[in-house]
Amino acid sequence: MDQIGVKPYTVCLAKFRFLESEQFKVRPVIVAGHPYGTRQVVAVIPISSSAGAESIDVVLQNWQAAGLLKASVARVHRISATLLKDLLEEIGSIDKIDQAAIKAALKELLIL
């Protein structure tokens, strides 16, 4: 994916690699920062349509506009880093209401 197209609150499909294998699965994520460093590391928040969210996770109110196929949850408690090259395709963006909820959750999680 072209770095120019990656900005916070973009929803992308990303490769999630298994720790002890070359295998991966493709999952939607919310870009939570700008690419950083020589390896172009990007903070991402995984998205899931599965029930069982933690209290800090955010139920996306406008999931369809974000390019998602099902009602979904931003798994804020599982924020992680991936390489820019593992972002495969932009599928949408998070609206202002959901952005505010995610920002509040990140502030609580990271004690900012």
Label the predicted regions.
Residues 63-112:
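C-terminal terminal-subdomain/extension
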Residues 20-26, 31-64:
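Compact nucleic-acid interaction/catalytic patches
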